[in-house]
Design a protein with these regions (language model features):
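Extended alpha-helical scaffolding segments used for macromolecular assembly and cargo binding
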Residues: 1-120, 124, 129-137
C-alpha cells in the first residue's frame, strides 16, 4: 500500500546520508525509522529488506546505546536476529544474540533472542546444541 511505499522510500533516502548525521537525537530518530521500516518489512515477509533496515538501524547506534537507548537497542537487535533467521543467514545471529544476552536488563528480554538462536541451531542440524541451550533457558 502507498503508506508502506512512502515509509520505505523515505527511510531509503535518509539512510543514504545517515552516517553523516552527527547530532545524536537526529541519528536516533533515523535508527527508530529503520526499526519501523524493518518491522513493516517483516510483516510483509520481505525479510532481506527487513534485515537491511535493521542492520542500518544498529549501525547508527552510538557506543553507549544499551545504556541510553535500551528499548530501541533491544528491539533492533532482536528483530535483526529474527530477520536473519528468516533469510537463512545464521552467521550473524549468535553475535547479535550475544549482545542481547550481555545487556538485557531482565530475563524476559533475553527470551526472543534465545528462541531465535535455538531455532537457528536446529535449522543448521546442531540439534544437541539447540537442546542444550533450550535446557539452559529453562
Amino acid at each position: 500500500d502507498r503508506a508502506n511505499d512512502v515509509l520505505f522510500i523515505a527511510v531509503d533516502q535518509l539512510n543514504r546520508g545517515g552516517n553523516a548525521i552527527k547530532v545524536e537525537h537526529k541519528r536516533m530518530e533515523l535508527a527508530k525509522l529503520n526499526l519501523q521500516a524493518g518491522e513493516k518489512a517483516m510483516s510483509l515477509a520481505t525479510f532481506v529488506n527487513a534485515a537491511s533496515y535493521l542492520k542500518k538501524g544498529i549501525s547508527l547506534l552510538y557506543e553507549d546505546h544499551w545504556e541510553k537507548y535500551y528499548d530501541l537497542s533491544l528491539k533492533l537487535y532482536s528483530l535483526y536476529a529474527e530477520a536473519e533467521y528468516c533469510n537463512g543467514r545464521f552467521h550473524d545471529i549468535s553475535q547479535v544474540a550475544a549482545g542481547v544476552f550481555k545487556h538485557a536488563k531482565i530475563y524476559q528480554d533475553k527470551l526472543r533472542a534465545y528462541a531465535i538462536l535455538i531455532k537457528a541451531l536446529g535449522a543448521q542440524y546442531k540439534l544437541q546444541n539447540a537442546m542444550n541451550m533450550g535446557f539452559e533457558v529453562l
